[in-house]
Amino acid sequence: SKCGFSDCGDFTGSAKDILPGGQYNDRFLAYIDMIAEYAHRLQEHNIPVIFRPFHENNGSWFWWGGEHMSEQDSIKLYQYLVEQLQERNVHNFLYVYSPNGPFNSEKDYMARYPGDKYVDILAIDSYDFYYDYPATYSDNFFKNMQKSCEIIHNVAIKHDKLAAISETGCGVMKPDKSNYGG
């Protein structure tokens, strides 16, 4: 059956299932092997990859985030993935840490940060959603984005990383007040 981002079931324990000793670890490693194989083909042609695993890991709309996974398990999972790719000699990836914004503090932003040796770019994913039609403009999104970008910029300087906006956009209601349209 089809499901959306957040209505596909209970994913609690997913990290433990795919980390070493978990029932799906072999399957996870097989996926990592596929990623590494493709990365090597790109590497042969000196093509870098900006890799953003487990993005928006502070939200609950993916199995790897929010209420489905503790902060510690989220960190372990990210670290494990990077370590496995490095063990497979993948050296053309720039790794991006990109939780969903907005953020109120550096502590808020860094809650699931896997550590400097696992990340090259510090980023944010953040969207502006309008829940009415026609949309009523508000500058709150831009104020929140500015504050979040300042936080990320400051963290990036402290950790000698690049700062970026990795995903953003605007969602508006359709005239029939159904799902978001672009």
Language-model segments: which ranges?
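Glycoside hydrolase catalytic-domain groove-lining segments
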Residues: 106-175
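A Trp-anchored, charged/polar loop motif used as the substrate-binding/catalytic surface
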Residues: 26-38, 98-108, 145-148
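Aromatic-lined carbohydrate-recognition surfaces of secreted/lumenal glycan-active proteins
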Residues: 52-54, 78, 82-107, 160-173
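Short linear motifs at secondary-structure transitions and domain/linker junctions
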Residues: 25-26, 71-73, 96-101, 137-141
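Long, well-ordered alpha-helical scaffolding segments within enzyme catalytic domains
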Residues: 31-34, 70-86, 144-159, 176, ...
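Short, glycine/charged-enriched secondary-structure capping and boundary segments
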Residues: 65-66, 138, 178-180
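Proline-rich intrinsically disordered, low-complexity coils
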Residues: 20, 48, 53, 99-102, ...
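Substrate-binding cleft of extracellular glycoside hydrolase catalytic domains
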Residues: 1-92
